[in-house]
Amino acid sequence: MSSTMQATEIRLDGRRVLVTGAARGLGEAFARALVAAGARVVISDVLHERGEALARELGTAAHYVPMDLADGASITAGVEAAAAALGGLDGLINNGAITNSGGKTMQQLDAATWDRVMDVNVRGTWLTTVAAQPHLAASGSGRVVNLASDTALWGAPRLMAYIASKGAVIAMTRGMARELGPQGITVNAIAPGLTLVEATAYVPEERHQYYLRARDE
């Protein structure tokens, strides 16, 4: 008898999912995986040409909707456009985020940068979830996945605004789960480590290695 276990293929046929920050990087990977699993997806981003090109590549299962996570009106309009394009929403992946502060000490960080990171990563995640809530509740089995970061769990240095924002996302996820659970909406967060994507290409190799070592110390 073979001891090899085969992974069960996850199918999401007909599920309708909005992914923020999906024009590149992890968001793009999520969108591709969702479509491959049978879901219908709305790609939202501020990188319009990239987002539109990805939607065209993925075919009729994907749509692009512009959305600026620093702008409340843009978020509301984007979520409504996504729900209209898909005929509702079953899932939301709050992936969109910015760093903007990598490599700076907390003393070097300016208040404007701090506020910008919080606006996008924290306020944007909150407002997107609020806007999507009626559609997710109507689904009967709504799902929200928030993107946190393991840097918030071990306290990566020279990344203060970002790790603070991702710590807030973890706390918000717990609160959202309690508030939205009775409405049939499940809320979870994932906290990936430093991922080699276009948005992290600026990070020097020695810093990658430091992150790998330091989080285990």
Label the model's feature ranges.
Residues 129, 165, 173:
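Active-site helix of classical SDR
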Residues 149:
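Residue(s) in the substrate-gating loop at a strand-loop-helix junction
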